[in-house]
Amino acid sequence: MKLIIFTGLVLFAIVSLIEAQAENEKACLPQYQVCTDAPGNCCSNVVCDCYGRYKSGARIGRNCFCLQKGVIYKREN
């Protein structure tokens, strides 16, 4: 009887641990995906980089994308 109770408790602990780990592993956004509404959801190898959009000198919005860490993007004419 004690063995059955012990086995049940061990199985319960294992299932609880697996469920807790699954909750912590949220889907992340890969490179070049839009992260404007979720800046903390980019995968670990990329960072959410935001850029302001301007028209005639007035700011009209911003765009955020998951981009490689440490990479500098420059506009080409």
UniProtKB/Swiss-Prot annotation:
Contains 4 disulfide bonds. It comes from the Eukaryota. It holds the Pfam family Toxin_35. Keywords: Disulfide bond, Secreted, Signal, Toxin. One of its GO terms (molecular function) is toxin activity. Belongs to the neurotoxin 19 (CSTX) family. 08 (U8-Lctx) subfamily. This is U8-lycotoxin-Ls1d. It comes from Lycosa singoriensis. The lineage of its organism: Eukaryota, Metazoa, Ecdysozoa, Arthropoda, Chelicerata.
